[in-house]
Amino acid sequence: SKPRGGQNYYVDAQNGDDRADGKSEKTAWKSLSRTKEIQLNAGDSLLLRRNSSFNGLLEVSAEGMAGRPVVIGAYGTGRKPCIQAPDSSLYTVLVRNSDYLTLENLEVVNTGKQRMANRTGVKVLCEDYGVSHDIVLRALHIHDVNGSLIKQKGGGSGILIVNRGK
């Protein structure tokens, strides 16, 4: 269910236009890089069109509220939207210093040409942020993350949660 009072933003890799406002399915943006120009607030949603494939990074920092999370997910019908990181990326999706955020119904891939230390699919980072509340990761298909096989610090991971600093 869509939280009341929020703004939906839409991204459509096939039919979108980065010069549009992104505020409706008909005026969807084309690229994930366009989403870096907005501030997501309580009740807002960032929705990627199903059956779309995005080559790029999804980087989000958002502060929702209890009962009014920021939702990053999918719209339309068909398979989950797929985000494939560029070759030398350490992550595909970065959720940084956020509260009350739900990430759902996405396919996340970070293959790269060769194995790489610290490569991950979804990275949740809290840095000098204190306590982060209610980060929900749901119905994600994370696969082909070609990270290092080291099973300690420096290894690869599908989901990596890091809390450092104060």
Task: Give a label for each model feature.
Residues 7, 44, 56, 68-70, ...:
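The right-handed parallel beta-helix/beta-solenoid scaffold, focusing on the short coil/turn
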Residues 49-50, 63-117, 144-150:
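Right-handed parallel beta-helix/beta-spiral solenoid domain characteristic of secreted/periplasmic
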Residues 56-57, 110-112, 127, 140-146, ...:
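Surface-exposed loop/turn segments connecting beta-strands in extracellular beta-rich domains
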Residues 11-49, 53, 59:
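Acidic Gly/Asp/Thr-rich repetitive segments characteristic of extracellular carbohydrate-active
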Residues 1-6:
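N-terminal pre-domain segments of enzymes
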Residues 86-94, 115-128, 150-166:
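Extracellular beta-strand/beta-solenoid scaffold signature
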